[in-house]
Curated annotation (Swiss-Prot):
EC code: 1.3.3.15
Regulation of its activity: The generation of protoporphyrin IX, but not coproporphyrin III, is stimulated by heme-bound HemQ. This stimulatory effect is mediated by superoxide. Inhibited by acifluorfen analogs.
Organism: Staphylococcus aureus (strain NCTC 8325 / PS 47)
Protein name, entry field: Coproporphyrinogen III oxidase
GO molecular function, one term: oxidoreductase activity
């Protein structure tokens, strides 16, 4: 008898889950329920007058190869693009400083660029050197904040001016609350293995160099995109699973998931009902609490903070903007008096996105705990971005157009202890809800390849239990 699985959510995790379900069992009956009118979730590519603009995620990390492999499987191998490499900067102390060469996420691995940078004072550099002498950092209950860990290893100055701008922005979380073991456990592993974070990351750098030497003609950039945007990946994945028999229902809100020992009843669109053997839930926690909120095991998600952010895109004629910094973008130290947290010079990092003679800039607004995105109109956010960017470049005219995309409560914050909570919840789900999995960014996926990996694992686990 044919088994059936319902997937809630047609974002990258949900579509990937459908792909891997069909890969495991081509005969399985798969239906995706999506409340909106399109697939992709936060992924949204916008094409206008020769521009290709990402309103959500901009790219993915190439060394997490599962997304590249999946792209090849669905026919997009020739569309994969690698970013143009160039200098990245940190805005601190009212100035743009080049990120020291050889550093990995701000951690120095080459002595000369670190010693000569003006971003860190001589005393701050000396303090960072104590990492070579310190014993491994003690954790309480198996976790520690990113801030406490790097402050102990490299000192406060390196933390504030190098580490925090690079790491804090990825997760939209105060680094003194951000869980190390939920986000960057590899740094703790390197510290334990080598007795020093600097030594450990130097080893990591050497491994990457050796890997690159195996493929001398490969592009040097870390990030991948598609020449028609990330939405082209979503569209190809959607078409692939539909060709394999997956049904996708858009504009379909799930009202409830009713459990039983043998099957799950999906209640949708005001009391319509269907029964499935298995369920994969891939929505944000604010949504899945509607169905699991009565279960005390899910109480952790009721107190989980999420940061609201916005991307602000500005398109200029190149004569109307002067930028003396040759690079691909910058991040901002939290000690700086700005509302933006980072900026990508998109036309330099991804030249294919921008017509000849034009400049495309993408700025990010929204810090943990602030309300700047909620408190201002789109026009006001554009003005705020231009005000902040005027500290780094000169505007000689107005942008040809601007786009503001708000992402309300889109970045779940992984506070210290998060990974332990998630493991307990996942164990509870496996025990209490057989053939059902809940997955997505609220658990442990932030990058796009991580979402695909979670979808694959969830699909394989449900298949094994059917």
């Amino acid at each position: 008898m044919t088994k059936s699985v319902a997937i809630i959510g047609a974002g990258i995790t949900g579509l990937s889950s459908a792909y891997f379900l069909k890969q495991q069992d081509p005969n399985i009956d798969v239906t995706i329920f999506e409340a909106s009118n399109r697939p992709g979730g936060k992924i949204q590519s916008y094409r206008k007058d020769g521009y290709m603009i990402e309103l959500g995620p901009e790219s993915y990390l190439g060394r997490k190869t599962i997304m590249t492999e999946l792209a090849k499987d669905i026919g997009l191998e020739q569309d994969i693009v690698t970013n143009t490499t160039g200098q990245s900067y940190i805005f601190a102390k009212n100035k743009l400083y080049p990120i020291p060469g050889g550093s990995i996420m701000g951690i120095p691995t080459d002595i000369k660029p670190f010693v000569t940078t003006k971003l860190i004072s001589p005393l701050g550099k000396l303090r960072a050197g104590f990492d070579l002498l310190k014993k491994p950092t003690q954790m309480q209950d198996g976790d520690i904040s990113v801030g406490a860990f790097f402050r102990a290893r490299l000192g406060n100055e390196v933390l504030e001016n190098l580490i925090e701008p690079l790491m804090g922005g990825i997760y939209g979380t105060d680094i003194d609350k951000l869980s190390l073991m939920s986000t960057f456990p590899n740094f703790k592993e390197k510290e334990e293995a080598f007795g020093s974070l600097i030594k450990g990351m130097k080893d990591e750098k050497n491994k990457r160099l050796k890997q690159r030497q195996l493929y001398p003609g490969a592009p040097k950039g870390q990030f991948k995109q598609f020449k028609h945007g990330l939405s082209s990946f979503i569209e190809a994945l959607e078409q692939d699973v539909k060709n394999k028999g997956v049904t996708i229902r858009y504009n379909t809100s799930v009202d409830d998931i009713i459990t039983s020992q043998k099957q799950y009843k999906i209640v949708y669109n005001d009391q319509l009902e269907e029964v499935y053997d298995g369920v994969l839930v891939t929505t944000p926690h604010q949504v899945f609490l509607n169905w699991f909120g009565q279960d005390p095991a899910f109480d952790y998600f009721k107190t989980m903070d999420s940061t609201t952010v916005a991307t602000v895109v500005l398109a200029f004629d190149e004569k109307d903007i002067e930028n003396t910094h040759d690079g691909t973008g910058f991040v901002i130290a939290r000690t700086s008096d700005t509302d933006i947290t980072a900026c990508t010079w998109t036309s330099k990092k991804w030249p294919f996105t921008t017509p000849e003679g034009k400049v495309l800039i993408r700025a990010y607004v929204g810090k943990p705990g602030d309300t700047v995105v909620d408190d201002h109109t789109d026009n006001e956010l554009v003005s705020i971005v231009r005000r902040d960017l005027s500290q780094m470049m000169t505007f000689k005219g107005d942008p040809e157009f601007t786009i503001v995309n708000r992402l309300p409560k889109s970045m779940p914050q992984y506070h210290v202890g998060h990974i332990q909570q998630i493991r307990q919840i996942q164990a509870h789900i496996k025990q209490t809800y057989p053939r059902l999995r809940v997955t997505g960014a609220s658990f442990e996926a932030v990058g796009l390849p991580d979402c695909i990996t979670q979808g694959k694992v969830a699909a394989e686990e449900v298949i094994a239990e059917l």
